């Protein structure tokens, strides 16, 4: 057990002895916060560990929770799990600890254990805001597991408790679309059909309606709610001038076995390297997939943005001297539109991931064709359209094609029409 930690206002002597019994939880929390602010997370953890072992027992579960939070932030997940388990062992109704324990299980690839913790929060009559949190976690993870009816039911319960949750409305609507649950905009609780309609995501709206006004409304609402307004000057203006090849940067979280990742490898490979330098800026989870290896090899430079905040990501793009930044994500799942709001490149373009307007103020151009953005729809597009001939969508011609299945392998008769 680490040495007791003295509670000193300046945190300058974190090892002087003091009787744990004399310390209140408030004392410990305040000192731990000072240690964290000083960059000494290890001492803050040791402080909690000492107080949990030898301090008064009344609020020990809270100290275990705080310790678990620190350990989780340091990615010491096994120790964080032990701390949260101790917290709920000491106080079984401690909803905060169960919520965090569920997140740890999810991160560890144990979805059923995560779901069990969040259901336990609901079974123990937690405060309403924590029940909402638990229902939302259940809905999100159940959707990820493709258990769509259960996911929809969970989000419905959340919205019955609080109908003023735009992101939850968005997912609820999309879940009904996935299940072909008609009508999609079925009122319930305090939510009207119109509120469900206006809460629809852009991608869901593009499949629900061909009305360009509704599509632009969905995109604009997302931007207003989710993308920060930045007053600072565009980042690219602060970069020194440079010469040489044009630097094109591709921005995406889908450079793997994803629809976009399957389409673009040959696009990257066929850039004229005498004229262009090709950069990738991605937050794709790293793996040894052959598809991801090929995508990496097709880029001259790859900058990983996973775990990097949006402002820092934009600075990395600006410092790379990117001339044209091509966003392959749009407003689809996993998008990071705030990066574009910083204006890291003098020209920013939307392409491929979203076949329509993004309404993002940092995007200048939309690469499209006569079908994605016909001239009569331009008034409903915030970007200026550049129409490619024939079809806007690239497709990798080198992609391996699976063998055509035989009728017999599908259990079909040879001499019958199906």
Feature names for model-found ranges:
Residues 1-413:
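Alpha-helical solenoid repeat scaffolds of the TPR/TPR-like class and their adjacent stem/linker regions
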Residues 414-418:
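Basic, alpha-helical interaction scaffolds
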């Amino acid at each position: 057990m680490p040495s007791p930690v003295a509670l000193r206002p300046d945190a300058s002597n974190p090892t002087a002895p003091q009787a744990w019994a004399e310390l209140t939880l408030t004392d410990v929390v305040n000192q731990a916060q000072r240690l964290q602010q000083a960059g000494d997370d290890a001492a803050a953890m040791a402080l909690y560990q000492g107080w949990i072992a030898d301090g008064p027992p009344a609020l020990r579960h809270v100290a275990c929770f705080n310790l678990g939070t620190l350990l989780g932030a340091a990615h010491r997940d096994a120790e964080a799990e032990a701390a949260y388990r101790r917290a709920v062992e000491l106080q079984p109704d401690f909803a905060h600890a169960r919520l965090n324990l569920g997140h740890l299980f999810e991160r560890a690839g144990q979805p059923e254990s995560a779901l069990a913790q969040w259901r336990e929060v609901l079974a123990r009559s937690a405060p309403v805001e924590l029940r909402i949190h638990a229902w939302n976690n259940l809905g999100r993870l159940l959707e990820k597991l493709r258990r769509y009816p259960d996911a929809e039911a969970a989000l419905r319960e959340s919205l019955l408790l609080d109908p003023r949750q735009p992101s939850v409305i968005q997912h609820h609507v999309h879940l009904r679309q996935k299940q072909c649950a008609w009508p999609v905009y079925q009122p319930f609780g305090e939510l009207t059909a119109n509120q469900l309609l206006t809460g629809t995501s852009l991608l869901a709206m593009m499949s629900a309606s061909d009305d360009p006004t509704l599509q632009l409304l969905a995109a604009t609402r997302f931007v207003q709610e989710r993308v920060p307004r930045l007053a600072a000057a565009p980042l690219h203006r602060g970069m020194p001038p440079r010469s040489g090849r044009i630097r094109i940067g591709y921005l995406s979280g889908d450079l793997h076995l994803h629809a976009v990742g399957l389409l673009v490898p040959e696009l990257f490979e066929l850039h004229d390297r005498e004229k262009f330098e090709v950069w990738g800026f991605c937050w794709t989870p790293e793996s040894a997939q052959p598809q991801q290896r090929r995508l990496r090899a097709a880029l001259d430079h790859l900058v990983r943005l996973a775990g990097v905040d949006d402002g820092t990501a934009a600075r990395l793009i600006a410092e790379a001297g990117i001339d044209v930044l091509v966003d392959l994500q749009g407003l689809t799942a996993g998008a990071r539109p705030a990066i574009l709001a910083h204006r890291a490149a003098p020209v920013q373009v939307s392409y491929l991931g979203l076949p329509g307007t993004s309404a993002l103020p940092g995007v200048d151009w939309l690469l499209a064709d006569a079908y994605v953005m016909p001239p009569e729809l331009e008034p409903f597009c915030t970007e200026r359209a550049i129409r490619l001939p024939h079809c806007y969508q690239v497709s990798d011609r080198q992609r391996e094609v699976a063998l055509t299945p035989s009728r017999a392998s599908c259990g079909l008769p040879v001499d019958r029409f199906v």
